[in-house]
Regions:
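Accessory RNA 3′-end/elbow-binding domains used by RNA modification enzymes
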Residues: 1-13, 17-36, 40, 44-47, ...
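Phosphate-centric recognition/catalysis
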Residues: 50
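Short, charged/polar surface micro-motifs in flexible loops or helix N-caps
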Residues: 53-56, 78
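Structural signature of FAD isoalloxazine-binding scaffolds in flavoprotein oxidoreductases
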Residues: 60-75, 140-154
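Acidic, low-complexity central loop/insert segments
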Residues: 61-114
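Extended alpha-helical targeting/anchoring segments
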Residues: 121, 125-144
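Pseudouridine synthase
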Residues: 122, 164-207
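Short amphipathic beta-strand and strand-loop transition segments with alternating hydrophobic
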Residues: 150-158, 283-285
Length: 300
């Protein structure tokens, strides 16, 4: 039986870890070679892309994918983890905060900004994850990291003793919404935490196209798992593709290169066979004709 090969756009529910979902997917597909792209905190929900089978080799070409989050931030309360999973550190009445005051400070957090990751995070520090030090009661001084926040949009503001705001945030990978909530609270001198989080998009993966774990299991019962997997050209649409014949495919696998009448360059190219299966990634090389395709990844 041919190993499944593709990407699964899965919805992570709150309460499960990202690795929990990978374990469940391994049981459903019956293979171990499954990985996820972009960890979501246990309390968060939303899009969690999974690479199935040989598609795990492709994650490195998705790492710069822009993320879109929708998060609720509660002002006046600080927690140890900057989200609802942590212990409360301080409560401070913050009814004076208005939508206008939040609008005033939002521009400070757009563009290339420095952000200190949360103590409770998977960042490596002296051989361990930061959260492992935190569990031992050791405070670590994590270095600020450069992140890019492309846009922040206020979707809703709710007044009260501890006012809340719902924000849509588009950012580069590596940006922590929990840290953004913390920093907004510090700027307003009230403290704040991330009360809930949904990831709406991760690169080409969008929540409106995503499957729940239950839906995937149902497809497995119906022997229709192939229907939930996205092929490479859907996910790697930013990389040009070329289709080749079965004869050319055989030659590529035998010689580890393939003559192609395409101008050379540094940009990657996808090669697809007659069944529209991704078989290789590589570049066109050569100083004169005949130019040739040199693979950097082969999926045989």
């Amino acid at each position: 039986m041919k190993e499944p090969f593709g990407f699964l756009n899965l919805i992570k529910p709150p309460g499960m870890t990202s690795h929990d979902l990978v374990d469940e997917a391994r049981k459903v597909f019956g293979i171990k070679r499954i990985g996820h792209g972009g960890t979501l905190d246990p309390g968060a929900s939303g899009v969690l892309p999974l690479a199935v089978g040989r598609a795990t080799k492709l994650f490195e070409y998705l790492q710069e994918s822009v993320k879109l989050y929708r998060g609720e931030i509660t002002f006046g309360i600080s927690t140890t983890s900057h989200d609802a999973q942590g212990d409360i550190l301080e409560k401070k009445e913050a009814s004076w905060i208005t939508k206008e005051k939040i609008e005033e400070i939002i521009p400070l957090f757009i563009g290339e900004v420095q952000q200190i990751p949360p103590q409770v995070s998977a960042i490596h520090f002296k051989g361990k994850r930061s959260y492992e030090w935190t569990r031992k009661g050791v405070k670590v001084d994590l270095e600020p990291r450069n992140v890019r926040i492309e846009n922040i949009v206020i979707k809703k503001f709710m007044e009260g003793e501890f006012p809340k705001v719902i924000l849509d945030v588009k950012s580069s990978p590596g940006m922590y919404m929990r840290a953004l909530a913390r920093d907004l609270g510090e700027k307003l001198e009230t403290g704040a935490f991330l009360s809930f989080l949904v990831r709406l998009e991760s690169g080409p993966f969008k929540i409106e196209d995503a499957y729940t774990l239950e839906e995937v299991k149902e497809k497995a019962l119906q022997e229709e798992l192939g229907a939930v997997l996205l092929k490479g050209d859907r996910v790697l649409s930013h990389i040009p593709k070329i289709s080749i014949s079965e004869q050319q495919k055989t030659l590529l696998f035998r010689a580890n290169r393939l003559p192609l009448d395409t101008e050379p360059g540094k940009n990657l190219i996808q090669l697809y066979d007659e069944e529209e299966e991704l078989i290789a990634l590589g570049t066109i090389k050569g100083e004169k004709r005949p130019y040739y395709f040199q693979p950097v990844k082969i999926f045989d």
